[in-house]
């Protein structure tokens, strides 16, 4: 009888290479993806961006019963976007998976001896290679997990799945906003799983239900045309730098505490969120950023 535990065991065997395929499990699959130099930050790689989707991801998804399409980016000069869907029953929930197959520059000459950007290399319990952690490894794991569920349940998931994989994330996801706006109905789903972010600690699987947002704006003080000499006019004319410093100081105090009430959730952090975060480890030190307790 099909079970959740059975699907997890199938996925585990595939990841560990402990299955009928032997060593050609997830590591071999990821090695093939890493070997495609699909960097979005180097000129002349357009063919590799297409090859990653058309030669690797689309055939895999189609083998699992997805209908997949590769679209040109709405903005010229940026990588294509793949969408795919597998609808078992429109009345059932739909999951949308996001990933990106492009990587940062290879920087071949900056890797230490024994490592290359487009070759998957295992050292201890770590795998090295461009895309292993950002983001080929993540979306490959998600698709492999779906494959394990399909195998366990005789070709049925019990829910619908849509996939979007872009090839311009490392250039600011240029064109993705326009693409989503134009295909909003096709990408409609009940839940989004975007596996592209850090763990709180390398050994701790992390589910993030939200991320810090940002709002960009220019804060400008224009008092006069041209500049004046501080030796002649210092202390007599208004200094725009001081005005800006006080404006920034009214937004956040010296310890990073936000002072603008409208930027904070009403009533503070919800109790459910506090409970979910209780006991959650926070990384720091080593290769990570230093955690400042007072900030």
Predicted region positions:
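Acidic/His- and Gly-rich active-site-bordering loop/insert found
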Residues: 2-132, 151-159
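Structural signal for hydrophobic packing residues in well-ordered secondary-structure cores
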Residues: 19, 61, 65, 150, ...
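Predominant activation on well-ordered alpha-helical scaffold segments within soluble catalytic domains
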Residues: 31, 58, 140-143, 147, ...
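Acidic/histidine-rich catalytic neighborhood of metal-dependent amide-processing enzymes
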Residues: 126, 131-210, 277
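Short small-residue beta-strand/loop micro-motif enriched in glycine and branched aliphatics
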Residues: 127-129, 225-231
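Acidic-enriched catalytic cores of C-N bond-cleaving enzymes acting on peptides and small amides
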Residues: 200, 209, 230-295
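Flexible glycine/proline-rich, aromatic-decorated loop/lid segments
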Residues: 208-222
């Amino acid at each position: 009888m099909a079970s959740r535990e059975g699907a997890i065991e199938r996925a585990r065997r595939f990841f560990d290479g402990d299955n009928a395929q032997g060593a050609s499990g997830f590591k071999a699959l990821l090695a093939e993806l890493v070997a495609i130099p699909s960097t979005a930050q180097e000129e002349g790689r357009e063919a590799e961006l297409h090859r990653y989707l058309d030669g690797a991801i689309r055939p895999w998804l189609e083998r699992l019963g997805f209908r997949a399409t590769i679209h040109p980016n709405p903005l010229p000069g940026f990588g294509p976007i793949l969408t795919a869907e597998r609808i078992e029953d429109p009345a059932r929930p739909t999951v949308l998976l996001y990933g990106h197959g492009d990587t940062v520059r290879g920087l071949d000459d900056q890797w230490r001896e024994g490592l290359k950007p487009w070759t998957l290399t295992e050292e201890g319990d770590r795998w090295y290679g461009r895309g292993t952690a950002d983001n080929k490894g993540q979306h490959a794991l998600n698709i492999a997990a779906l494959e394990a569920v399909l195998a366990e349940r005789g070709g049925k998931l019990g829910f619908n799945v849509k996939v979007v994989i872009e090839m311009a994330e490392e250039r600011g996801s240029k064109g993705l906003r326009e693409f989503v706006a134009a295909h909003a109905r096709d990408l409609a789903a009940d839940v989004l799983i975007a596996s592209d972010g850090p763990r709180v600690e390398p050994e701790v699987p992390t589910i993030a239900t939200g991320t810090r947002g940002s709002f960009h704006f220019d804060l400008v003080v224009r008092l006069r045309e041209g500049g004046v000499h501080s030796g002649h006019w210092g202390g007599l004319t208004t200094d725009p730098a001081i005005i800006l410093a006080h404006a920034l100081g009214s937004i956040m105090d010296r310890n990073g505490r936000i002072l603008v009430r409208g930027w904070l959730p009403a009533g503070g952090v919800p109790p459910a969120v506090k409970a979910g975060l209780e006991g959650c480890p926070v990384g720091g030190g080593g290769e990570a950023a230093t955690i400042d307790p007072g900030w």
